[in-house]
């Protein structure tokens, strides 16, 4: 119980601290560029035309809504985080308790099993089920979080309170509205998890020397590196999921010119890929302006 409470508190603290970052990221993912590009330098010192970074973007939001505005959507996101942590822990606890009778077997067999790829598959499968269950239950809060952020673009107040947002979504879209963008989000999580754990196992088994004294530390590093690599590869699923969650929901940020009306998440994926926007919002610094791209800032000036 104490471990669960500490995880909830730690997760809530990190959620609060990262809220402004996520807010900016979501607006960029939608395609909202309120500030004009500037001439800057990339990490190699070369002059390039850049879009505003995280701090300039956050300062723009704060100049309109104040610093408190940077924490828009925090309440449903906290609810999602707390509920997700509890569900994830309960599912893993169920598997651990169901495995206890099997622990009476031979110690030698247990050691051989623990070092095999079968154990990696078993643990990854359990983690996948736990994460998927948490994602499925908390996705309605995720949708509300995204929509409350995106309404900054059109200065709407459609999704302000948690209860009012639930009523609005149910009245306009039914139960299905609470799960907009769920499929690409689940697929991204599952692919990322399996890719991360499989690569970490291969590195730890075949690339690292088991006789090294810092073996455990090196394994933790390899897990972190493979996790970062997997998240980079599966980022398009995150982008598509977030866009589908706000698409055609009655907000300016989910409608043209910021976002086309997508018929499905596959349609969204194809259109982003065709436009070369599969990594939009992945970087919050050194955001180079792609050649031939038109942003909402330019469209606003033409109106």
From Swiss-Prot:
Phenotypic effect of disruption: Mice homozygous for a knockout allele exhibit abnormal mesoderm development, disorganized extraembryonic tissue, lack of amnion and chorion formation, decreased embryo size and lethality at around 7.5 dpc. Conditional knockout in the liver decreases the sensitivity of mice to Fas-induced hepatocellular apoptosis and prevents the recruitment of tBID to liver mitochondria. Conditional knockout in skeletal muscle results in increased mitochondrial mass and metabolism granting protection against diet-induced obesity.
GO BP: any one term: cellular response to radiation
Domain of life: Eukaryota
Protein name: Mitochondrial carrier homolog 2
Cytoplasmic side stretches: 37-77, 157-180, 253-280
Keyword Protein transport: no
Gene Ontology cellular-component terms listed: mitochondrial inner membrane; mitochondrial outer membrane; mitochondrion
InterPro entries hit by this protein: Mitochondrial_sb/sol_carrier (IPR018108), Mt_carrier_dom_sf (IPR023395)
Membrane topology: Multi-pass membrane protein
Pfam families the record matches: Mito_carr
Solcar repeat ranges, renumbered to this chain: 2-98, 118-206
Broad class of the protein's primary localization: mitochondrion
A molecular-function term among this protein's GO annotations: membrane insertase activity
Positions in the Mitochondrial intermembrane compartment: 2-15, 93-135, 200-231
PANTHER family associated with the record: MITOCHONDRIAL CARRIER HOMOLOG, MITOCHONDRIAL CARRIER HOMOLOG 2
Tissue specificity of this protein: Expressed in a wide variety of tissues. Predominant expressed in liver, kidney, heart, skeletal muscle and testis.
TM spans (from-to): 16-36, 78-92, 136-156, 181-199, 232-252, 281-303
Post-translational modification N-acetylalanine, affected residues: 2
Task of the protein: Protein insertase that mediates insertion of transmembrane proteins into the mitochondrial outer membrane. Catalyzes insertion of proteins with alpha-helical transmembrane regions, such as signal-anchored, tail-anchored and multi-pass membrane proteins. Does not mediate insertion of beta-barrel transmembrane proteins. Also acts as a receptor for the truncated form of pro-apoptotic BH3-interacting domain death agonist (p15 BID) and has therefore a critical function in apoptosis. Regulates the quiescence/cycling of hematopoietic stem cells (HSCs).
Keywords: Acetylation, Apoptosis, Membrane, Mitochondrion, Mitochondrion outer membrane, Repeat, Transmembrane, Transmembrane helix
Similarity annotation: Belongs to the mitochondrial carrier (TC 2.A.29) family.
Assembly, per entry: Interacts with p15BID.
Subcellular location: Mitochondrion outer membrane
């Amino acid at each position: 119980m104490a471990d669960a409470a500490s995880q909830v508190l730690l997760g809530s603290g990190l959620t609060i601290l990262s809220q402004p970052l996520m807010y900016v990221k979501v607006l960029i993912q939608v395609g909202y560029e309120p500030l004009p590009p500037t001439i800057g330098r990339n990490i190699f010192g070369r002059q390039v035309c850049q879009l505003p970074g995280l701090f300039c973007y956050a300062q723009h939001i704060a100049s309109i809504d104040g610093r408190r505005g940077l924490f828009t959507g925090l309440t449903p996101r906290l609810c999602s985080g707390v509920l997700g942590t509890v569900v994830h822990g309960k599912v893993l606890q169920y598997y651990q308790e169901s495995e206890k009778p099997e622990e009476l077997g031979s110690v030698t067999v247990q050691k051989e099993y623990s070092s095999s790829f079968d154990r990696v598959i078993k643990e990854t499968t359990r983690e996948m089920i736990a994460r998927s269950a948490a994602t499925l239950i908390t996705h309605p809060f995720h949708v509300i979080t995204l929509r409350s952020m995106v309404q900054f673009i059109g200065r709407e107040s459609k999704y302000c309170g948690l209860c009012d947002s639930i009523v609005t979504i149910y009245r306009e879209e039914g139960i299905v509205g609470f799960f907009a963008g769920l499929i690409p989000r689940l697929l991204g999580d599952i692919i990322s998890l399996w890719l991360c754990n499989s690569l970490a196992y291969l590195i730890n088994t075949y690339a690292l020397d088991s006789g090294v004294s810092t073996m455990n530390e090196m394994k933790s590093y390899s897990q972190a590196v493979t996790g970062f690599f997997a998240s980079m590869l599966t980022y398009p699923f995150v982008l598509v999921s977030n866009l589908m969650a706000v698409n055609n929901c009655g907000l300016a940020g989910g409608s043209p010119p910021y976002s086309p009306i997508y018929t499905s998440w596959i349609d969204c994926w194809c259109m982003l890929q065709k436009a070369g926007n599969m990594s939009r919002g992945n970087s919050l610094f050194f955001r180079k302006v792609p050649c031939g791209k038109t942003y909402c800032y330019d469209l606003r000036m033409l109106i």
